[in-house]
Amino acid sequence: MKTPFSKMDGLGNQIIVADMRESTHALTPQAILSLAADSQTYFDQIMAIHLPTKKEADFRIEIWNADGSMANACGNGTRCVIAWLTDHNYGEIFRLETPAGIVEGKRQIDNLISVDMGCPNFNAKEMPVSREIIDTNHVELTAGPLRDACLVSIGNLHAIFFVENDIQYIPLEKYGSKLEHDPLFPQRCNISIACVTSQESLNLRTWERGAGLTQACGSAACASAVAAYRRGLTKRNIDVNLPGGTLNIFYREDDHIIMTGPVKYGFSGFLNPLTGSYKKDDF
């Protein structure tokens, strides 16, 4: 009962990529929580690779948060999957079936990984919110100094708060959980604070749904870039600076969002999908 896996790092976003294609057992809640609690395998998301169910996809991805809940999208995790598939010689360009739809990714010449995250959704009627919202560009939502959120769905829902001062001075660890569980969001929400530093860059911190305060969140970087452009604060192609590093986000004219950035490997090995026990590869 050996499932190959790699512990990876997407700008400080801790990711486990697990190849479940030949596994006869699904990941259990016990295994997920055990891996999350371990000092070496702790993660923000597990990206579980499965055989596709759609003919237009090469692989299917399940995404698990550290609290055992499932996610519809994970940008940095998707970049890690693309790197893993490339390094294991499965091809050069990949179409991945995710809960949010088909995403496409590839490794660039400079060794960075790019993923087409698809198109953002601003339609409140298609978002899991509990009340009618007329304009998702300006939503009444308050916690401390944070107010006037922009809601964007990148397959998962994000609330972005733009501030003029240094985002480090706002205790997101204090307000993040409160906003994540606000009654407006029956399925919870990712919460970010952003400060635009120029028409081509912004700084970002994110409280990730199901994971908490994180070093990086790829879908939040996409959502913040789109929200900033929508409010007329930035251009379409910008750098998003997160605590873990920088992602380039290109919001194309055709509405597709291209996210590009680095990934790193920690270690690889085999895990037991029932218990979460694991063994590292010997080098």
Swiss-Prot record:
InterPro entries referenced in this protein's UniProt entry, alphabetically: DAP_epimerase_AS, DAP_epimerase_DapF
GO cellular component: cytosol
One MF annotation (Gene Ontology) recorded for this entry: diaminopimelate epimerase activity
Compartment(s) of residence: Cytoplasm
Residues at the site labelled Could be important to modulate the pK values of the two catalytic cysteine residues: 158, 208
Record pathway: Amino-acid biosynthesis; L-lysine biosynthesis via DAP pathway; DL-2,6-diaminopimelate from LL-2,6-diaminopimelate: step 1/1
Active-site annotation: 74 (proton donor), 217 (proton acceptor)
Binding site for substrate: 13, 45, 65, 75-76, 156, 190, 208-209, 218-219
One Gene Ontology biological process: lysine biosynthetic process via diaminopimelate
E.C. designation(s): 5.1.1.7
Entry keyword Cell division: no
Stated family: Belongs to the diaminopimelate epimerase family.
SUBUNIT field: Homodimer.
Protein name: Diaminopimelate epimerase
